[in-house]
């Protein structure tokens, strides 16, 4: 296992009517603080047509953040790859890898929302084929001088990226996956499976075994870097943490439920419409410094995840609460975790 790493997930999702210019400045403050506190990576998610929330574009945001830090890796977590053409994505990420001096992580997933598929003219039955062909094409574009490849929905004729990425052979490819077949696909075509934030620990433990079997079948070793994302909030006590974050986490998961995220999750652990006290059971990192440290240690031991991407702010949450959690994580939780694992 690689040494333990911690990433900051900036969803950057805010209620309609909020001043996004002001919210952007707050996100910059969080990123600068994360860099100072020893976080390893910065993740920005991606959704189009994100009503009832508003958010900044992933590529634009991460490109801007490349100038705010010299250390944080820049994780596209995730690109809805089935909606796009491979040459476009290959060029965008290679360019940012050059600008950031080799800090890009290519996170990719299928997507699940009908509004996004329809807007990009993609039929649901096409999603998996588009995804796998795009991954293959992007790898080739990053590693070959000229690429000729006829996909089902694109054609490359002696095509090349205008600039190659700094990282060799290419930036790491993290494949986001919820269902077992998608995890098996991640083992075949990605550098690692990027574990979702929604499922209970027992589900993730079971799916890690699915992933290991798929790696064995593909003749691949378990990855040195194994990332997973989790919701996280730290306060003086668990009761206080739950009281403070309840309204904001509740709102976020109501939106997930309305968007249909449940449909992408495995049977038996696919109801994000649960009452809050049931939703948080064995699912999020919430509590005091000692409790959250122990939760992360336990999760690491049971799953093997060693790059924990933590989301610490949800729609409507004041900036001060997010900054307080980041401070507690960096100064108190992370040292305890590194000592305890």
Regions inferred by a protein language model and the residue ranges of each:
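N-terminal beta1-alpha1-beta2 module of alpha/beta enzyme domains
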Residues: 1-69, 73, 168-171
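An alpha-helical appendage that flanks or caps ligand/catalytic pockets
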Residues: 2, 36, 125-161, 200-306, ...
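Flexible, glycine-rich active-site loops centered on histidine and acidic residues
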Residues: 2-22, 82-149, 153, 193, ...
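Hydrophobic faces of well-ordered beta-strands that scaffold small-molecule active sites
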Residues: 6-10, 42-44, 74-76, 104-108, ...
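Active-site mouth loops of central-metabolism enzymes
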Residues: 10-25, 79-87, 167-178, 233-235, ...
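Conserved, mostly hydrophobic/aromatic
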Residues: 34, 38, 65, 96, ...
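Glycine-rich, proline-tolerant flexible connector loops at the mouths of alpha/beta enzymes
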Residues: 41-65, 80, 197-201, 311-322
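Alpha-helix-loop-beta-strand connector modules within alpha/beta enzyme cores
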Residues: 55-76, 130-134, 326-341
């Amino acid at each position: 296992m690689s040494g333990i790493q911690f990433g900051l997930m900036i969803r950057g999702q805010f209620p309609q009517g909020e001043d996004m210019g002001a919210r952007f400045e707050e996100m910059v403050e969080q990123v600068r603080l994360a860099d100072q506190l020893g976080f390893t990576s910065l993740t920005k998610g991606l959704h189009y047509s994100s009503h009832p929330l508003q958010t900044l574009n992933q590529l634009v945001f991460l490109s801007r953040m490349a100038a705010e830090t010299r250390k944080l890796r820049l994780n596209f977590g995730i690109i809805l790859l089935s909606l796009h053409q491979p040459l476009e994505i290959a060029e965008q990420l290679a360019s940012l890898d050059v600008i950031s001096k080799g800090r890009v992580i290519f996170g990719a997933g299928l997507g699940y929302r009908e509004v996004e598929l329809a807007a990009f003219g993609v039929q649901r039955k096409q999603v998996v084929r588009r995804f796998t062909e795009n991954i293959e094409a992007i790898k080739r574009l990053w590693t070959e001088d000229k690429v000729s490849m006829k996909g089902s929905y694109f054609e490359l004729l002696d095509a090349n990226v205008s600039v190659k990425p700094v990282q060799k052979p290419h930036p790491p490819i993290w494949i986001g996956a919820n269902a077992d077949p998608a995890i098996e696909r991640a083992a075949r075509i990605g550098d690692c499976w990027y574990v979702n934030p929604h499922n209970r620990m027992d589900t993730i433990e079971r799916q890690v075994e699915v992933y290991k079997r798929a790696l064995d079948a593909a003749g691949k070793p378990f990855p040195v870097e194994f990332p997973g994302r989790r919701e996280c909030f730290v306060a003086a006590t668990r009761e206080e943490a739950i009281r403070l974050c309840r309204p904001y986490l509740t709102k976020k998961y109501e939106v997930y439920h309305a968007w249909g995220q449940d449909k992408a999750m495995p049977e038996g652990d696919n109801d994000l419409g649960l009452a809050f006290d049931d939703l948080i059971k064995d699912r999020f990192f919430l509590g005091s410094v000692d409790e959250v440290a122990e939760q992360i240690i336990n999760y690491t031991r049971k799953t093997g995840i060693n790059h924990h991407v933590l989301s610490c702010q949800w729609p409507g949450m004041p900036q001060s609460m997010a900054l307080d959690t980041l401070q507690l994580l960096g100064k108190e939780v992370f040292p305890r975790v590194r000592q305890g694992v």
